[in-house]
Amino acid sequence: MSEVKVSVIMPVYGVEEYVGGAIESIQNQTFTDWEMFAVDDGTKDKSGEICDAYAAKDSRIHVIHKENGGAPSARNVAIDKAQGKYFYFMDSDDFAEPTMLADMVEAAEKHNAQLVVSGYYIDTYYSNTEKYTQEQGVEGKVYSSQQEFREDAYRLFDQNLLYTPWNKLYSGDYIREHKLYFPNTFWDDFPFNLSVLRDVERVVVIPGKYYHFIRKRAESETTKYRSNMYEKREEEHGWMVDLYKHWGVDDEHSREFLARRYIERVIGCVENVTNKSCTLSFSEKEKEIKRIISNAKVKELLPLMQAKSTYMKLMLIPIKMQSAFLTHCEGAFISKVKTGNVKLFASLKAKR
C-alpha cells in the first residue's frame, strides 16, 4: 500500500466555474503528502476536462470518469481506490484554508484519532459580490474515552459539527475495517457520518475554522419544494434515536437535544410546504401543515425541548396552539424571507 498520508475525495458534477478553485485550495495546502481523487460523475459541462488539465500537471491528482450515479456513488468509487492513511471528503464548489490538512493530520497523529473534527465557514452569497459569512467555531477537545464522546455528542450536534464530512478527517483504516460507504440517498452525508459515529472510539476536536461551504441561494437545493421532506425528517429522527440507543446514552441533555432537533426539523417541513415552488393549493398546504404539527411525536417532544432563542420561541407559539392557519402564515413569512432576503434569512437561521 502506498505511504500517502491523506486521500482527498471529491465528486465532480456541473461545477466548471468552481472546481478549479476547489482543486487549487488543496494544491495550496501547507501539507503536501496527499492524493486527490476527482470523480467526474458523468458531468455534462467541462468540469471533467478541467480536472484532467490539473491532473496532467500534478501527479497527485487522479481523475475518474464514470457514468452519472450521484455524489454517493462517486465518493464510493474513490473510497475503494484511495490509499491514504486518512480520508478527507470535500465538495467541488467549495474551498479550504491552506493549513487545514496540516492541522488535522497533526491532531490525528498526536492522539491516534479515528476522527478529527474542526470548525468551518458558511459563505452565503446574496449577490455576485456580497455575502453573509457564518463562522462555526468550536473549542478544542481530546476525548479520553468513547463514553465521554458519546455523552458530549449532543453539544457537537448542536453546533452542527457532526453532520457533514467536509469538516472532518477520517481514519482510512476505520473506514475500510467497518466497510463504510455513502448510501445512495438524498442528504447522504448524514447517514454516512452516523455510521462513522456509531462505534468510533478516539475523537479529537480542533478549534480552527478551515472549510468554506459556499451557498448560492438562487441555485440552492434549500429553496426547492420537496414533497417527501417530512418523511425524510421522520426517518432522520429514527436514525438519531437508534444511534443514542446503540450508545446507551439517555441523559437529560441528550433527550432535550433530540426533542429540540426534531421540532426544529418540523418547522423546516412547514417552511418547505409554504415554499413558493410548492404547487399545492392553499387548503392543501394547510391540510399538510395540520398533518405535520398534529403528529403525536410533536406533542410528545415539545414539552421536552428548550428554545434557545427568542426567534425559536416565537416560531413555536402557533405549533403549541395546534393552529394550522397561524403556522401556515408563519411558515409563509419565513419562506418569503428565505427567497427574498437571503441575508436576513441566513442570520435568522444561525440564531435558531
PLM feature segments, named:
Residues 87:
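Short aromatic/hydrophobic "clamp" motif used to bind/position activated sugar donors
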Residues 113, 275-352:
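Membrane-interface aromatic/basic loop that binds lipid-linked glycans or pyrophosphate carriers
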Residues 32, 40-49, 67:
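A conserved acidic beta->alpha catalytic loop
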Residues 26, 41-42, 55, 69-70, ...:
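Conserved short acidic donor-positioning loop in nucleotide-sugar-dependent glycosyltransferases
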Residues 71, 92-228:
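Donor-binding/catalytic cores of nucleotide-activated saccharide
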Residues 1-27:
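N-proximal low-complexity "stem/linker" segments adjacent to membrane-targeting elements
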Residues 208-217, 223-252, 268, 272, ...:
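Catalytic core of nucleotide-sugar-dependent glycosyltransferases
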